[in-house]
């Protein structure tokens, strides 16, 4: 399995290093493109067409080649899209293995950030809207509890999440199309 996290892989997060932060983002296949809906409000919010999934390198294909996802979505044929689908398949099919790999990568990411004198921050919903606060790991009620000194942040269209208790190190911003 390839890596799950993208570390400072876009211009916006690279700029954060000047402010003292190193960012790791998890990009999965959004909405229903993996065959499982990872963005529960995508249809209602009307954001499938404008999704970041095909922005940047995710939108560049080999020539004009495309491929069809398990849900029937047609996407640019590139390694970015195929990696997002592979990550999503692992998440959907073997959550314990996915969470173990995620913990391993966050641990390595923290060490990398600390070596550079930067503060690690993690965004788990780069192109998804998963309720991570409800997904247990082998050792904790959620991934944020496993890394209580690390700041996690996400954007969500599931407004009900903001009315519920969240881990102290998890910041959610409501984002609606």
Question: Which stretches of residues belong to each language-model region?
Answer:
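Class I S-adenosyl-L-methionine
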Residues: 1-177
